[in-house]
């Protein structure tokens, strides 16, 4: 997914539905991330969503709700090819995250891939360590003080910026698509600079296609645009706004 030099366009699944996952998987995304942190999705929802996504060429990822080995291992066994891990603040936490994603001797992931043996074949364990994408989220005040030690941790493939929590961490209001006049924007560029220095991928969550394009032009390798829930809401609102009954007048001869 991230070997051809092109930026990855990532979709975001917050709706606990195979129908939504299927619709998203057929829209041309390079990858889809199932959000198990802030979305409405739990494991029982995520498993059939992963099965649905696996009928396409889209790479399935998941954002776990915490840097907790059991949850990371279980969702990997369910069919994820990458983990977005929130709130990674220092090297020790980065090491714990990486090791939960990798089989010995590189980590302590327990062997029991279940679906992996179906879609990855009997040699799944031989190549899983190299194929699983590991993105550590930079979004805490402490992480901003430890960028190089996090990014230089062996096995960390890249970082992922959560602009909302990052903004809160530095005393600004939460939100996506930070203006260039904000401190959060300056920190985003500083994080990107450190990622490039450490030769790892840099990802960021965006609210609009315009901002995602801007971030690609700045050098980000991995951009997420909104989510299925936001797209549904925006599409529905645009439809209603276009044909708003509050602006229509019935003909005088219309039967009541």
Predicted regions and their residues:
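N-terminal amphipathic alpha-helix/helix-capping segment at the start of soluble metabolic enzymes
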Residues: 1-10, 122-128, 190
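Conserved N-terminal beta1-alpha1 strand-loop-helix module at the mouth
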Residues: 1-60, 66-67, 155
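Conserved, mostly hydrophobic/aromatic
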Residues: 11, 35, 83, 97, ...
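Active-site-adjacent beta->alpha loops and helix N-cap segments on the catalytic face
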Residues: 38-52, 68-71, 89-102, 115-122, ...
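Conserved anion-binding
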Residues: 70, 85-153, 165-168
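Catalytic cores of alpha/beta
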Residues: 70-81, 93, 145-151, 208-218
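Glycine-rich phosphate-binding active-site loops on the catalytic face of alpha/beta enzymes
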Residues: 85-90, 163-168, 221-237
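Conserved small/polar residues in nucleotide/adenosyl-binding loops
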Residues: 246-252
